[in-house]
Amino acid sequence: METLSARFTVLQEKLMDIYESGVEDLDTQIQHWQLLRQEQIIYHYARRHGVTRLGYQPVPSLASSEAKAKDAISMVLLLESLKKSKYADEQWTLAQTSLEAVRSPPADCFKKGPKNIEVVFDGDPENLMSYTVWTYIYYLTDEDIWEKVEGHVDYTGAYYYEGKLKVYYLKFENDAKRYGVTGLWEVHVNKDTVFTPVTSSTPPVGDSTDSASRAALPEPSTSVSPERPPSQTARRYGRKASSPSTTSRRQRKGQRETTGTQRRRKSRSRSRSTNRGGRDTRRSSSRGSSVSPTRGRRRGGGDSRRRGPVTRSRSRSLSRASSAGGGISPDKVGTAVRSVGRQSGGRLTRLLADAADPPVILLRGDANTLKCYRYRFRKKHAGGFRFVSTTWSWIGDASNDRIGRSRMLLAFYSESQREKFIQTMKLPTGVEWSLGQFDDL
C-alpha cells in the first residue's frame, strides 16, 4: 500500500503543476483528463482492497470512482477527436474542456464565449430567470467532423445551426409554463429588451426560423377525426352547427323553398278569385300551410301575417310539404336539423345531445407527471379527443402563489367519446380526475 500511496502522491503533484501553469492548449487538457482517469483507477483499486484513505484524501466508493473514471475516458476520446480537427490549435482552457461545460446545453459540444441573458415572465421584473448562452459552439457531425458555428437567441430560445437545421438547446416556453401564468415572456440581453411577445398565444415549438411570427397563425388540419368538430360561428336561437352534408342539403332545400313559396302565392290568388266568383261558399284559408291536393285536408299552422315570421325549421318543413305535394310523417319532423347520429336514441335524446355543452375531463397531479402522461396518450389516443391543454394552476386573489397541484384539461366532441376515453385511459399514480362541461371552448 505504500507504493499505491506514492503513485497517488505523484499524480497529485502532476495535477497541481497543470493547475499552476495555466497552459491553454489542447495537449495539456488531454493530459489533465488522463491524469484524472488514473486517479480514479487508484481510488477504485484501493477501495477494493479495503483502503479508505490515501494520505489525507478519503477514498470514495467503488460506484463513484467507476463512474468518474468512465467520464474521464469519454472526455479523453472527445478531446483526442477534437485534436484531429482544424480547431486543435485554438486556445483551450480547463473551464472550456470541463465535464460540466461539455454536458451543459447543448450537450456533448464544446462552447466558447458565454453570455448571460434574462427572461422576464408575465411582464413582472421580479419573475425572471437568468440563462447562459454561447457565442461559439463546436459540434460533431455524423461523419465525425467537428464544426464551429455561432450561437443565436430569439423569442423562442437559444439555438445554433447544424447545416441548415435549426437546433434549439434552450426553450423559454418550458420555464414559462413552470414559473409564469400568462405564458408570455420578454428576452433581455445586456439589460435591453430585444424580444417581446407579439401575440397573446404561446410561441410554437417548431424549429423554423419564423417560429415567433407563426404564433398567431392557425395550424391547418392534416387528419380527419372520427367526430367532426362543430362550427364555431354563432347560430340562430343557440342552435349548434350541423354536419357539411346537412348544410348542403339545406342549400338545395332553400331553392325548393323559393319555388314552394311562389306556388303558395299562386294558390292563394286562385282561391281568392274563386271566392269572388261565388263558385265556392267556403272561405279559403290564408294560413302559412297549404292544402294538400291529394288528401283534401288542411295542415295546421299559424297565420304568417298575424303571428310574425315563421321559424327556420318550421318554414323548412312547410316548403318540403309544398314541394312534395303532400305532408310528412311525424317521425320525419326535424330530421333536417339533426347534428347527432341516428343511432343516438329517440328524438328527445338527440335534441338533448344536440344542445349539450362540450364535455371535459379535469386531471390533477404533479406537473411533470401530467406532461409525461399527455405525451403518451396523444400518441395512444390520437383522434380520441378534441383538445388537450397545457398544465396550469389556480392562484389566489391576493398573490401569484400557486394553489394546490397542477391541472390539465381534456375536451371531447361528445359524451360518448368521453366515455370511450375513460374506459381505456390509465392514469399515473397520484393523478386524480373529475368530469365537467363548458358553455364553449
Curated annotation (Swiss-Prot):
Region (Disordered) residue spans: 195-336
Location(s), subcellular: Host nucleus
Keywords: Activator, DNA replication, DNA-binding, Early protein, Host nucleus, Phosphoprotein, Repressor, Transcription, Transcription regulation
Comp. bias (Basic residues): 262-273, 307-317
A GO-annotated cellular component: host cell nucleus
MF-aspect GO terms: DNA binding; DNA-binding transcription factor activity; nucleotide binding
Region DNA-binding domain, residue ranges: 357-441
Comp. bias intervals (Low complexity): 195-211
Any GO BP: viral DNA genome replication
Coiled coil: none
Domain of life, per lineage: Viruses
Segments of skewed composition (Polar residues): 220-234
Chief site of localization: host cell
Post-translational modifications: Phosphorylated.
Residue numbers spanned by region Transactivation domain: 1-201
Subunit and partners: Binds DNA as homodimer. Interacts with protein E1; this interaction greatly increases E1 DNA-binding activity. Interacts with protein L1; this interaction enhances E2-dependent replication and transcription activation. Interacts with protein L2; this interaction inhibits E2 transcriptional activity but not DNA replication function E2. Interacts with protein E7; this interaction inhibits E7 oncogenic activity. Interacts with host TAF1; this interaction modulates E2-dependent transcriptional regulation. Interacts with host BRD4; this interaction mediates E2 transcriptional activation function.
HAMAP family recorded: PPV_E2
Family classification: Belongs to the papillomaviridae E2 protein family.
The protein's role, per its UniProt record: Plays a role in the initiation of viral DNA replication. A dimer of E2 interacts with a dimer of E1 in order to improve specificity of E1 DNA binding activity. Once the complex recognizes and binds DNA at specific sites, the E2 dimer is removed from DNA. E2 also regulates viral transcription through binding to the E2RE response element (5'-ACCNNNNNNGGT-3') present in multiple copies in the regulatory regions of the viral genome. Activates or represses transcription depending on E2RE's position with regards to proximal promoter elements including the TATA-box.
Protein name (Swiss-Prot/TrEMBL): Regulatory protein E2
Species classification: Viruses, Monodnaviria, Shotokuvirae, Cossaviricota, Papovaviricetes
Gene: E2
